[in-house]
Curated annotation (Swiss-Prot):
<keyword id="KW-0460">Magnesium</keyword>
<dbReference type="GO" id="GO:0046081">
    <property type="term" value="P:dUTP catabolic process"/>
</dbReference>
<dbReference type="GO" id="GO:0000287">
    <property type="term" value="F:magnesium ion binding"/>
</dbReference>
<comment type="function">
    <text>This enzyme is involved in nucleotide metabolism: it produces dUMP, the immediate precursor of thymidine nucleotides and it decreases the intracellular concentration of dUTP so that uracil cannot be incorporated into DNA.</text>
</comment>
<dbReference type="GO" id="GO:0004170">
    <property type="term" value="F:dUTP diphosphatase activity"/>
</dbReference>
<dbReference type="Pfam" id="PF00692">
    <property type="entry name" value="dUTPase"/>
</dbReference>
<comment type="similarity">
    <text>Belongs to the dUTPase family.</text>
</comment>
<keyword id="KW-0546">Nucleotide metabolism</keyword>
<feature type="binding site">
    <location>
        <position position="94"/>
    </location>
    <ligand>
        <name>substrate</name>
    </ligand>
</feature>
<keyword id="KW-0479">Metal-binding</keyword>
<protein>
    <recommendedName>
        <fullName>Deoxyuridine 5'-triphosphate nucleotidohydrolase</fullName>
        <ecNumber>3.6.1.23</ecNumber>
    </recommendedName>
</protein>
<feature type="binding site">
    <location>
        <position position="80"/>
    </location>
    <ligand>
        <name>substrate</name>
    </ligand>
</feature>
<dbReference type="InterPro" id="IPR008181">
    <property type="entry name" value="dUTPase"/>
</dbReference>
<feature type="binding site">
    <location>
        <begin position="84"/>
        <end position="86"/>
    </location>
    <ligand>
        <name>substrate</name>
    </ligand>
</feature>
<dbReference type="InterPro" id="IPR036157">
    <property type="entry name" value="dUTPase-like_sf"/>
</dbReference>
<dbReference type="InterPro" id="IPR033704">
    <property type="entry name" value="dUTPase_trimeric"/>
</dbReference>
<dbReference type="GO" id="GO:0006226">
    <property type="term" value="P:dUMP biosynthetic process"/>
</dbReference>
Length: 148
């Protein structure tokens, strides 16, 4: 599937287009479209531009997710992961990041900061009923299936 993309920010010496790291990658890396380094202090958030805008077909969304390396090594994640980019949004993609670590985290220009997964979704309509179909689980929730 071809998707239209607008480059809002041009990186010097490298591409700003989202890219798959390997042939088996589900997510494409997104890059920090910043001109100079920026610090995210512990327990603070930052809105980081990705330097692109996209035009997804109806019935598709882009999910913005954390990169596992940033999360495991530094405690830096996408705050609302997965963030949803709707098919009718045409503005620049911006990533809400939070530093859950204990030290300042420095973002550098063109750093890989998040990943984007394109997913198909269904548009539904509601059918109001008095009762739902029975299941073995029923209304049990919040730990009812145990830990092991």
């Amino acid at each position: 599937m071809k998707v239209k993309i607008k480059q809002i920010y041009q990186f010097e010496g490298t591409s700003s287009l989202p890219a798959y790291s390997t042939n088996g990658s589900a997510g494409m890396d997104l890059y920090a479209a910043i001109a100079s380094p920026m610090i995210i202090k512990p327990h603070e958030t930052a809105l980081v531009p990705a330097g692109i805008a996209i035009s997804l077909p109806y019935g598709y969304e882009a999910q913005i997710r954390s990169r596992s390396g940033l999360a495991s090594k530094f405690g830096v994640i996408v705050l609302n992961s997965p963030g949803t980019i709707d098919s009718d949004y045409r503005g620049e993609l911006k990533i809400i990041m939070i530093n859950l670590g204990q030290k300042d985290f420095q973002l550098t220009p063109a750093m890989r900061i998040a990943q984007m997964v394109i997913a198909k979704y269904e548009v539904i309509s509601w059918e109001i009923v008095d009762d739902l179909d029975e299941t073995e689980r029923g209304e049990k929730g919040f730990g009812s299936s145990g830990l092991k």
